[in-house]
Amino acid sequence: MAAAFLNLGGYVFVFFSSFLAIVAPQVRGNVAVFDSYWTQRQSDALKQTIGSYDPHPLNVTNHFNYHVNIAVDASESRNDTRRELTQVRSGRKTHKSSGKCLAYNPIDNCWRCDRNWANNRKKLADCVLGFGRRTTGGKDGPIYVVKDASDNDLINPKPGTLRHAVTRDGPLWIIFARSMIIKLQQELMITSDKTIDGRGARVYIMEGAGLTLQFVNNVIIHNIYVKHIVPGNGGLIRDSEAHIGLRTKSDGDGISLFGATNIWIDHVSMTRCADGMIDAIDGSTAVTISNSHFTDHQEVMLFGARDEHVIDKKMQITVAFNHFGKRLEQRMPRCRYGTIHVVNNDYTHWEMYAIGGNMNPTIISQGNRFIAPPNEEAKQITKREYTPYGEWKSWNWQSEGDYFLNGAYFVQSGKANAWSSKPKTPLPNKFTIRPKPGTMVRKLTMDAGVLGCKLGEAC
């Protein structure tokens, strides 16, 4: 996860790796020294966590499912010819051959069929649903164009590089002048109110360190590849426009959320990270992970890292419209505490289990498709870890509208709808809590992962 840092105060210090090895196990949250800058950021982040928590999660899941129903019903009425239905059945990403844009899920339906998307990029910020629905990223700031794929200066990053962009003060909407491969020398410290928007280019973050969102608020990560991420050795790294810090070795997570709030990760393709693909810990909440594609990894998502971190009871995350693909082993996600809405995802492969956790997380699984592996010992979707039945039988793990294939099965516990107070503003009865069923998932996830957006064309 996130590594450690030390304020330089304008001076340059040299620390040996042996010093870091001694300090690292003793630090709080991997922070070697809390200077006034990071103490303030941590304090602000805790306030954001508490303020971003929704005491009525059922209202959020209702809102989400309502919009899915509206979008699917509208798309079905527009696209009911035999040719178009055949295309959807035949596989993913074949819909453009008809010359029409099909966007069944409401997030994509909000923006993706606009041929003028490149001149209206910030429309994307109006489209997020789920627990991260208030995320706007850099909507209120100017466009920043990344023109240089290098990452050679970690202390004073070169203008025009991604590292320079994400460490600026204030909101920015970050786009890319061309396709590029960015090999991060050390973890990329992203500050608040940023959008990383890879549309119109092929942007690969690969064969280097990953992305870190530590004690930040309001970030969108959209339409990029994150592949072959490795641990960083740590060292002096700029973590904001006015601050440079000393970091210990990073774990090799693809995207690491540490005390991060109002985060939206959308249309990301992720493969082979040294540790987790997406980890959200230590008070991270108000997060939506959507329309993404995951392959070739052991431990995909970790939500909550330690039993003693009870702040993660405030954790609320939506996992929606994703494709969990080939050669994945477990943790899709693995949860400690919190409320996790897992909805309309396609689980086509897992080797051990799909969804697991401990410390009484609430897991609401709705309208997913689960295809179990051939191994008879791995057909159970769920796994409660380090907890006897007498304790976990009261946890609220509910399945509704899921589609089970090849012997897959979900072991439920708790009582239906006991996990939330009644909605403050109930929606029409037709849509209350009712997801689109797992049989619809192929349509809802058919464009999961990075989109090949071209100027003047629908994505």
Swiss-Prot record:
Belongs to the polysaccharide lyase 1 family. It comes from the Eukaryota. Ca(2+) binds at residues 251, 275, 279. This is Probable pectate lyase 3. Its cofactor is Ca(2+). The keyword Metal-binding applies. It catalyses: Eliminative cleavage of (1->4)-alpha-D-galacturonan to give oligosaccharides with 4-deoxy-alpha-D-galact-4-enuronosyl groups at their non-reducing ends. Its EC number is 4.2.2.2. Pathway: Glycan metabolism; pectin degradation; 2-dehydro-3-deoxy-D-gluconate from pectin: step 2/5. The active site is at residue 331. One of its GO terms (biological process) is plant-type cell wall organization. It comes from Arabidopsis thaliana. Residues 1-29 form the signal peptide. Keywords: Calcium, Glycoprotein, Lyase, Metal-binding, Signal. Expressed in pollen, but not in leaves. Glycans are attached at residues 59, 79.
